[in-house]
Structure formats: C-alpha cells, structure tokens
Amino acid sequence: MQRSLKWFASTTTVAMLFVLIGGALVTKTDSGMGCGRSWPLCHGQWIPDDITPQLVIELSHRLVSGLAAIMVLILCIRSWRVMGHVRETKPLAVLSFVFLVLQSLIGAAAVVWGQSDFVMALHFGISLISFAAVLLLTLLIFEVDKKFSATSLQLDGQMRFHIYGIIIYSYLVVYTGALVRHTNASLACPSWPLCAKSRLLPVQFHEWVQMGHRLAAAVIIIWIAVATVHAARYYREQPVIYYGWIISLLLVLAQMVTGALVVFTELNLYISLAHAFFISCLFGVLSYLLLLALRTRRRPATAAGRSVEDTASAPLK
C-alpha cells in the first residue's frame, strides 16, 4: 500500500478524533453560541472584533471540522481508487463523509435556529460513526486484518451476539452520555455510584438523566466483561478477537473511572475530555470487531474440516 496514503489516513483519523474532542470541549465550556447565531462566520464577520474564550473554542472547532471534512473527502477518493476492490472500502468511504457532513449540518442548525437537547445529543453520536468509519478505512489501508490473520476467523453464534448487541447498545450509552452533557445534568447527582447517599432513587429530571446514563454504563461494563471472558475461553488462538475484547474491557473501565472522577472533581475539564476520548476509542474497537464479524458471515461456516459450532464447543488450548 502507498506510504503516502497510510500517512494521510493516519492523520485524517487523528483529525477526526480532534473533531470529537473539540465538540465535547464546546459543550463542556458552553461555547456553542460563542459565535452568536451566525454560521459559518462568527457574528457575521470573517475576523470578529470581540474575541472571547468561547468564541475561540467555537471557531476553532468549526475550523478543525472543516479541515477534517476536506481530509475525509480526499481520503475517500484516494482509498476508493487504490483499494476499491476491497468490499468494505466504498461503504466506509460513503459513511465517513456523509455522517461528517450530517453532524456539521446539525451543528449549524443548532447555532442558527436552535435545537432541543434531545436532538443535540445526537450530534456526538453522528460524529462518532464518521470517526469509526475513517478508523476502519485506515485499518484496511494498513492491512491490519492480514497481520492478525483476521481473514481466517471463525465466530460462534454467542460471540456474534456479543459483537452485534454491544455495539448497538454502546450507541445508546453514548446518546445517554451526550444527553447528560446537553441537559447540564453532569453534576445533578453529587454522589457516585448512587445519586445521593441518603436516598436510592432520583427525584427530579436531571437526576433521572444522570442515573439513567449510569445504569446504561453499568450494563455495558458487565456485558463487555462477559464477552471478554468468552473470548478468553474460546478465542485465545485468534488474537484479533481475544485482544480486541481485552482492549475493550480496559477502555470501558477507564470510561467508568473518568465518569466517576467527573463527579468527584466537579466537572474537571481534562477528565471530562478524557471521558469523551475513551468512549471514542471504545467505539472504534467495537466497530472493528463488527467489521470482522460481518466478514466471517459471508464465508462458509467451516474451517479445517470443523464447523464453527464444533470450534466453539471446547475451549482453545
């Protein structure tokens, strides 16, 4: 694969990560209206007269998003030409660009006309899909699947259930987390893991939003732990699956820790951004596992004379 394409794909992936973190920074610092009700300009000007921290954050996010959109478009065109023969290339290229444009339009609509918190909570999730698609394109360009013998994978039904179920459910968790930010419910519950030491259940809307997210997060932590145990028992000889789940477990635990620290530090900005970073990485890993699962589904369910069910019926040595 062309060295220049690999470098460009890596840079584009990092740029998309900056888009995600930048969006979280805008929300955390309440900088969404830093440029007023004007888009793409700031207060209708190319160079605003009154420079404020919120304006700098919002304008920087717009510039990074615009640059990332151009880079993603170039990456899509180049990858389409160079490796269009790979089945996943074209769908991933379309997903990465379309969802990046969509998140930009939602952001612009929020600035110009305003949007409800429930609609704005979709903004981060849509960006996350674009980031995951760019990341998968990059992994295909680096031929990671060949390096880890991913082309010979065989997955049993239980592992498929974990992969499909967890990535769908993780998107719900992401939405609840974004809703916490956009409804200003991050500090609605002063205690952790319960909302308050003196009572078990929330009593008002913001507390319900916060505790709903914590409950959803607890479920995904347990689910990923179960999937990791299954991978450790049956997939040690398939390192891309085994280590994929190990990394997922470490990331979701880091997500839990930073989520708790957000409460204990009363919304420390760096910890809040780390919280967004870890969920972005986790979704990227889960997306790659999904790609592998979809690939294996297209192949006959036999390997070396044994069925998938036979392979999964006994632990790998």
Curated annotation (Swiss-Prot):
Membrane topology: Multi-pass membrane protein
Transmembrane stretches, start-end: 7-27, 55-75, 92-112, 122-142, 160-180, 215-235, 244-264, 273-293
Cellular compartment(s): Cell membrane
Extracellular side: 28-54, 113-121, 181-214, 265-272
Protein keywords: Cell membrane, Disulfide bond, Heme biosynthesis, Iron, Membrane, Metal-binding, Oxidoreductase, Transmembrane, Transmembrane helix
Residues in the Cytoplasmic compartment per record: 1-6, 76-91, 143-159, 236-243, 294-317
Record's subunit section: Interacts with CtaB.
HAMAP family to which the protein is assigned, alphabetical: HemeA_synth_type1
Protein name per its UniProtKB record: Heme A synthase
Species assigned in the record: Geobacillus thermodenitrificans (strain NG80-2)
Lineage of the species this protein comes from: Bacteria, Bacillati, Bacillota, Bacilli, Bacillales
